[in-house]
Amino acid sequence: MSDERREGLAPEIEATGLVPMVVEQSARGERAYDIYSRLLKERVIFLVGPVEDHMANLIVAQLLFLESENPDKDIHIYINSPGGAVTAGLAIYDTMQFIKPDVSTVCIGQAASMGALLLTGGTKGKRYALPNSRMMIHQPLGGFQGQATDVDIHAREILDMRDRLNRIMAHHTGQDMETIARDTDRDNFMSPDTACEYGLVDAVLADRKALDQA
């Protein structure tokens, strides 16, 4: 039997809504992976859905694992997220900056709020959006009930976090703080071309050939 691997989707996943399984066959036998684990072998991470602590822990773990596997090879994060918790998103962002490999980011669908910050937090020159994706930036949301003094404490924390996020956005987009503060005062939606002009991404990709030329 040839050592060349043969891959195919396991038939039981058809029309079930379950995560597809990929079966690899070689001279050593068969092995089944869920599709995301198989793509992780190719250094592809999916950041999909609301950003929260459990999801952030999984993304951070995958980033650290891929760095340990090969610290000199790029990691690719595909983002389709409406945003979410600021602290969870910053855990992912800080890890992206901390590890040695370049981190390429690609917006598929949408990258809103914290999703947009993670998109623009990729390695300069390796941040992309697909043609029909959307990006949205805004200031952080928050609310608190309690004693007046505690409300004041939390209000000041939200303002401090807003400034921190604006500094990060300014650093990666090349926009000044005044522009970022103005443009994030309300929900600000961007097309891929507008996001590219703004500095959120570096290129809009219609196909893989465009990626080779980017």
UniProtKB/Swiss-Prot annotation:
Signal peptide: none annotated. Disulfide bonds: none annotated. One of its GO terms (biological process) is protein quality control for misfolded or incompletely synthesized proteins. The active site is at S113 (nucleophile), H138. It catalyses: Hydrolysis of proteins to small peptides in the presence of ATP and magnesium. alpha-casein is the usual test substrate. In the absence of ATP, only oligopeptides shorter than five residues are hydrolyzed (such as succinyl-Leu-Tyr-|-NHMec, and Leu-Tyr-Leu-|-Tyr-Trp, in which cleavage of the -Tyr-|-Leu- and -Tyr-|-Trp bonds also occurs). GO terms for molecular function: ATP-dependent peptidase activity; ATPase binding; serine-type endopeptidase activity. InterPro entries: ClpP, ClpP/crotonase-like_dom_sf, ClpP/TepA, ClpP_His_AS, ClpP_Ser_AS. Its EC number is 3.4.21.92. It comes from the Bacteria. GO terms for cellular component: cytoplasm; endopeptidase Clp complex. PROSITE patterns: CLP_PROTEASE_HIS, CLP_PROTEASE_SER. Keywords: Cytoplasm, Hydrolase, Protease, Serine protease. It is found in: Cytoplasm. HAMAP family: ClpP (MF_00444). PANTHER family: ATP-DEPENDENT CLP PROTEASE PROTEOLYTIC SUBUNIT. Cleaves peptides in various proteins in a process that requires ATP hydrolysis. Has a chymotrypsin-like activity. Plays a major role in the degradation of misfolded proteins. Belongs to the peptidase S14 family. NCBIfam families: clpP, PRK00277.1, PRK12553.1. Fourteen ClpP subunits assemble into 2 heptameric rings which stack back to back to give a disk-like structure with a central cavity, resembling the structure of eukaryotic proteasomes. This is ATP-dependent Clp protease proteolytic subunit.
